[in-house]
């Protein structure tokens, strides 16, 4: 099984990449977030290799968290790799985890190709889903979104409102996330 590939980028589209590795060019399907994170010449991607009757496909990820969400989603009956990539192109892994924890079905339905039935099934199947990486992870502190969520809870905000406020925030530090979330929370009350 292929776990990762490193090579030269021959062609890059928003959701697809041609990667030349040792004289062989691979077509790898990627999310929009992974595409944005990649350079123009070289890339190293974590790979999920799916073997189906009709095709052998490679799906690439710039981060382990994105790969973990993808691998979890494709195990759900009725959610295929295209739907999983659509979710990951719409939401970052921390935002997706917040949506699942808040049971925000409407946010999930904003993903192209995800209707009420699929959104409900995903919510049921992923109840209790956590983005924390398995043992051996270098991260010893919780993700910045988890820190922000806890800080907002300590200020007395309800978890449902916090989850809505944290959606689509692109900030990368706890302080920036909390600032943006507080602005959103003022309009949500």
Swiss-Prot record:
<feature type="region of interest" description="Domain II">
    <location>
        <begin position="63"/>
        <end position="138"/>
    </location>
</feature>
<dbReference type="InterPro" id="IPR010994">
    <property type="entry name" value="RuvA_2-like"/>
</dbReference>
<keyword id="KW-0234">DNA repair</keyword>
<dbReference type="GO" id="GO:0048476">
    <property type="term" value="C:Holliday junction resolvase complex"/>
</dbReference>
<dbReference type="GO" id="GO:0005737">
    <property type="term" value="C:cytoplasm"/>
</dbReference>
<dbReference type="Pfam" id="PF01330">
    <property type="entry name" value="RuvA_N"/>
</dbReference>
<dbReference type="Pfam" id="PF14520">
    <property type="entry name" value="HHH_5"/>
</dbReference>
<dbReference type="InterPro" id="IPR012340">
    <property type="entry name" value="NA-bd_OB-fold"/>
</dbReference>
<comment type="subunit">
    <text>Homotetramer. Forms an RuvA(8)-RuvB(12)-Holliday junction (HJ) complex. HJ DNA is sandwiched between 2 RuvA tetramers; dsDNA enters through RuvA and exits via RuvB. An RuvB hexamer assembles on each DNA strand where it exits the tetramer. Each RuvB hexamer is contacted by two RuvA subunits (via domain III) on 2 adjacent RuvB subunits; this complex drives branch migration. In the full resolvosome a probable DNA-RuvA(4)-RuvB(12)-RuvC(2) complex forms which resolves the HJ.</text>
</comment>
<keyword id="KW-0233">DNA recombination</keyword>
<dbReference type="GO" id="GO:0000400">
    <property type="term" value="F:four-way junction DNA binding"/>
</dbReference>
<feature type="region of interest" description="Flexible linker">
    <location>
        <begin position="138"/>
        <end position="139"/>
    </location>
</feature>
<dbReference type="InterPro" id="IPR011114">
    <property type="entry name" value="RuvA_C"/>
</dbReference>
<feature type="region of interest" description="Domain I">
    <location>
        <begin position="1"/>
        <end position="62"/>
    </location>
</feature>
<dbReference type="GO" id="GO:0006310">
    <property type="term" value="P:DNA recombination"/>
</dbReference>
<comment type="function">
    <text>The RuvA-RuvB-RuvC complex processes Holliday junction (HJ) DNA during genetic recombination and DNA repair, while the RuvA-RuvB complex plays an important role in the rescue of blocked DNA replication forks via replication fork reversal (RFR). RuvA specifically binds to HJ cruciform DNA, conferring on it an open structure. The RuvB hexamer acts as an ATP-dependent pump, pulling dsDNA into and through the RuvAB complex. HJ branch migration allows RuvC to scan DNA until it finds its consensus sequence, where it cleaves and resolves the cruciform DNA.</text>
</comment>
<dbReference type="InterPro" id="IPR013849">
    <property type="entry name" value="DNA_helicase_Holl-junc_RuvA_I"/>
</dbReference>
<dbReference type="GO" id="GO:0006281">
    <property type="term" value="P:DNA repair"/>
</dbReference>
<feature type="region of interest" description="Domain III">
    <location>
        <begin position="140"/>
        <end position="189"/>
    </location>
</feature>
<dbReference type="Pfam" id="PF07499">
    <property type="entry name" value="RuvA_C"/>
</dbReference>
<dbReference type="InterPro" id="IPR000085">
    <property type="entry name" value="RuvA"/>
</dbReference>
<dbReference type="InterPro" id="IPR003583">
    <property type="entry name" value="Hlx-hairpin-Hlx_DNA-bd_motif"/>
</dbReference>
<dbReference type="GO" id="GO:0009379">
    <property type="term" value="C:Holliday junction helicase complex"/>
</dbReference>
<comment type="similarity">
    <text>Belongs to the RuvA family.</text>
</comment>
<dbReference type="GO" id="GO:0005524">
    <property type="term" value="F:ATP binding"/>
</dbReference>
<keyword id="KW-0238">DNA-binding</keyword>
<keyword id="KW-0963">Cytoplasm</keyword>
<protein>
    <recommendedName>
        <fullName>Holliday junction branch migration complex subunit RuvA</fullName>
    </recommendedName>
</protein>
<keyword id="KW-0227">DNA damage</keyword>
<dbReference type="InterPro" id="IPR036267">
    <property type="entry name" value="RuvA_C_sf"/>
</dbReference>
<dbReference type="GO" id="GO:0009378">
    <property type="term" value="F:four-way junction helicase activity"/>
</dbReference>
């Amino acid at each position: 099984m292929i776990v990762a590939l490193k090579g030269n980028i021959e062609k890059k589209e928003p959701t697809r990449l041609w990667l030349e590795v040792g004289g062989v060019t691979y077509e790898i399907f990627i999310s929009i977030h992974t595409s944005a994170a990649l350079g123009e010449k070289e890339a190293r991607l974590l790979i999920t290799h799916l073997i189906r009757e009709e095709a052998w496909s490679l799906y690439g990820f710039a981060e382990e968290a994105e790969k973990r969400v993808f691998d979890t989603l494709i195990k759900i009956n009725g959610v295929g790799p295209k739907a999983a990539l659509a979710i990951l192109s719409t939401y970052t892994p921390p935002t997706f985890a917040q949506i699942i924890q808040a049971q925000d079905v409407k946010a999930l339905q904003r993903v192209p190709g995800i209707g009420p039935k699929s959104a409900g099934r995903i919510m049921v199947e992923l109840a209790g889903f956590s983005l924390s990486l398995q043992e051996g992870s270098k991260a010893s502190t919780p993700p910045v979104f988890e820190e922000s969520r806890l800080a907002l809870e300590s200020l007395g905000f309800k978890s449902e409102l916090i989850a809505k406020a944290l959606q689509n925030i692109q900030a990368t530090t706890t302080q920036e996330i909390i600032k943006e979330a507080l602005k959103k929370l003022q309009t949500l009350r």
